[in-house]
Amino acid sequence: MPFMYELKVAASEPSYTFVQRLVSVGSLVGTGEAVCTVTDGAMEFHVPAPRQGLVVEWFVEHGAVIEDGDSLVRIVCEGDEVEVPAVEPVRLG
């Protein structure tokens, strides 16, 4: 049975600014695959998908400030519904 989750950045992280989508609506993403790029003003980071699935909706645009609890993207997964944790961005380079 498919279920949906909304990808969020972990609350322990500082606020970020959204830079770029790396996948578009309708794309399949794998576990750990980078779905977007964000910046903290000094460095850029990739945000990985915690589960494999189909991207169905983006909630942010270029330049948006991402605050604690903001959803970035909605992804549909196959299988039994499980809790999907917020992710920590991975520094580029």
Identify the function of each model-found stretch.
Residues 1-37, 46, 52, 86-93:
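Acidic, low-complexity mobile loops and tails
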Residues 29-46, 67-85:
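Short hydrophobic beta/alpha edge segments that flank linear recognition/processing sites
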Residues 52-67, 90-93:
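Short peripheral tails and domain-boundary helices/loops at the edges of structured domains
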